[in-house]
Amino acid sequence: RWKVFKKIEKVGRNIRDGVIKAAPAIEVLGQAKAL
């Protein structure tokens, strides 16, 4: 029962880390398109 919850928590953390790392790259791409 707890293993499933821990697994979901781990996946959520990975997604959040990915978004945090991707955000600057997305901003740079947006600025590049604006130019």
Swiss-Prot record:
InterPro entries, A to Z: Cecropin (IPR000875)
Broad class of the protein's primary localization: secreted
PTM annotation (Leucine amide): residues: 35
Pfam family, any one: Cecropin
Expression triggers: By bacterial infection.
GO biological process, one term: killing of cells of another organism
Alphabetically ordered keywords of this record: Amidation, Antibiotic, Antimicrobial, Fungicide, Immunity, Innate immunity, Secreted
A single GO cellular-component term on record: extracellular region
Intracellular or extracellular location(s): Secreted
Tissue expression summary: Hemolymph.
Quaternary structure and partners: Monomer.
Summary of the function given for this chain in its UniProt record: Cecropins have lytic and antibacterial activity against several Gram-positive and Gram-negative bacteria. Also has activity against fungi.
Family stated for the protein in its record: Belongs to the cecropin family.
Protein name, UniProt field: Cecropin-A
